[in-house]
Curated annotation (Swiss-Prot):
Reaction equations catalysed: 4-aminobutanoate(out) + chloride(out) + 3 Na(+)(out) = 4-aminobutanoate(in) + chloride(in) + 3 Na(+)(in); glycine betaine(out) + 2 chloride(out) + 3 Na(+)(out) = glycine betaine(in) + 2 chloride(in) + 3 Na(+)(in)
Gene: SLC6A12
GO CC annotation, single: plasma membrane
Cytoplasmic topological domain: 1-44, 557-614
Protein name: Sodium- and chloride-dependent betaine transporter
Region annotated Disordered, chain positions: 574-614
InterPro entries the UniProt entry points to: Na/ntran_symport, Na/ntran_symport_betaine, SNS_sf
UniProtKB keywords: Cell membrane, Disulfide bond, Glycoprotein, Membrane, Neurotransmitter transport, Symport, Transmembrane, Transmembrane helix, Transport
Residues linked to a glycan: 171, 183
Domain of life: Eukaryota
Disulfides per UniProt: 157-166
Species annotation: Oryctolagus cuniculus (Rabbit)
GO molecular-function term, one example from the UniProt record: gamma-aminobutyric acid:sodium:chloride symporter activity
Any single biological process term in GO: glycine betaine transport
Amino acid sequence: MDTKLAVHEDAPPLVSWVPEEGEKLEQEGEDQAKDRGQWTNKMEFVLSVAGEIIGLSNVWRFPYLCYKNGGGAFFVPYFIFFFSCGIPVFFLEVALGQYTSQGSVTAWKKICPLFQGIGLASVVIESYLNVYYIIILAWALFYLFSSFTSELPWTTCTNSWNTEYCQHALNHSGAGIGSSTENFTSPVMEFWERRVLGITAGIHDLGALRWELALCLLLAWIVCYFCIWKGVKYTGKVVYFTATFPYLMLVILLIRGVTLPGAYQGIVYYLKPDLLRLKDPQVWMDAGTQIFFSFAICQGCLTALGSYNKYHNNCYRDSIALCFLNSATSFVAGFVVFSVLGFMSQEQGVPISEVAESGPGLAFIAFPKAVTMMPLSQLWSCLFFIMLIFLGLDSQFVCMECLVTASVDMFPRQLRKSGRRELLILAIAVLCYLIGLLLVTEGGMYIFQLFDYYACSGICLLFLSVFEVVSISWVYGADRFYDNIQDMIGYRPWPLVKISWLFLTPGLCLATFLFSLSKYSPLRYNNVYVYPAWGYCVGWFLAFSSMACVPLCIVIALLKAQGSFTKRLRQLITPDPSLPQPTQQLRLDSGPGQDRRPSPAKEGLVTVEKETHL
């Protein structure tokens, strides 16, 4: 179509835009986005990320760390890491995905081929998470089904799995719910270890398969499969329920918790500041690792979820809002947890230090014990485990979606064909389920602890975070990435973010990583069982299998490249030319919020800037 523009001789000068290769690449990018799929609206993205990052660690890890590390004083190192590491790295990963429209592996390959190993390392961590994280859902489902009885089975000592050492009330000092005296154990502990786990003497004896847990695990995988099998447009609808329902449960449990006798004392223990604890480096390490755990940083999930955003989505504002939402949820969850623990402390007549637990001990020992002391105990048990299931469910299927995204983006020709995605998801689910059966054997808890302590540890995440921020801020260029972000959102983010990328984040992460190594202590199950030497070797193999991806990929890339070392290095730090390039401003003082990218699909072959201020 021939377009003629009649312009008055006194009118402002016209600037014609001749379509070049960059516009063709942009059009190809739009077509690729259609092939990959995009979020229907911003809320789907926000809820999907919220579902991923707001999980079990918000409920069972943060409150205990806060109590253990000086109460309110713990917020000092927590918020230092929050602003200097949490928000900057979180935003970096989301912006990287949105800018490249690629999953974790191919995003790093396009922006800085030398550091493609960062993406591969995140895929390794995602794979481990897909195997072991869902085991928690199987346990929670087992407890939920066990709650539909006239009397909760962990209330009494008259069940077939109880031993002669079971004692219904351990009120005396030194016999809390998670501990045992020389001769006695509690019914809730025996239900957990003998009925649910059937735990053996050690990792050398895996024992038989716990078929009830295997069925619960199968149910969890079936639900996860159907939550993501049709792509992000379908997943975006699922998270409207799975990401919001836990908040309803949290509010109900909060109201119930703060109305219990003894709740005030528990909350005081949770928040009472002990500033002397800030002298302990362990407090700072716990704050840093908690930020990386709860924000799902360096796991590839944020990059994958961001890749389904529209190019001009304001990912900066979204990232800040999601980070604050995550921390606020952790803070509120602390009131739920410690109001109940305060109630337990008063009912049993023991110090709160003897009932305070973290991790599985809180979810499957402390809380089940607490609900037995409440009226309508079956109701509160059901509500609590439903909340746990939904907190874990969306974290699990979103993590699964991110692994699928990375795989499809690596092999688009093979896996983007009709029906291939569903088969890929099915294959991954079946494989992870079969491997997961090892974790629901009678000795499976020992394997679970290895995964949790080594495979997805803070050491791995801190290691990868250093390479992430260094590759973007120092190799690709912080100013260049800021230009890309400005092209996407229309303005440049707060300068502190760039300063953090350049100095604060790599410095703090490296210091915390080195301190974590220096303070390393071998895993002990229940602080008692010592693993055999080969067990620790397996654990460190799980840890190094992800971290080793970065240096190995650097070496392999340098060996495969052609030319001198300098030429090879230059090739490997050069971004892919197909990436969107910031457009040149055709005005002198026009607003920063305007979209400066020409769209040949919408404007035709000639784009005319009718108004200038020249």
